[in-house]
Amino acid sequence: MLKSAIEDFEKDRYEEALPLFEKLAREGNAEAMYYLGMMYYEGWGVDKDLDKAIEWWKRANRRGSLDAKYMLQTICSTSSVFARE
């Protein structure tokens, strides 16, 4: 299912990818959590929502996602988002 979700994502079929990533994320899949973060960060198939993006990346990071860790570090170093936490 992850492969299918990533294929949809890479082909800009975000509406098809979203429910697959959500299901996988609920099951604890860190890569799906990372992709959900990207979708919310960029507004791909969903409304842009930095808070949701950060929350998905935090969850993915706790499960060992280096991509999510990178995004969190990037956001932290370029924005004041974390100043309110």
Q: Where are the regions a protein language model picked out?
A:
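Short coil/turn and helix-start
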Residues: E10-K11, R26, W44-K48, R62, ...
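Hydrophobic face of amphipathic alpha-helices that form TPR/SEL1-like repeat modules
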Residues: L2-D8, K23, Y35-E42, M71-T78
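Extended, folded domain segments that form the structural surfaces/walls around functional sites
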Residues: F9, L18-P19
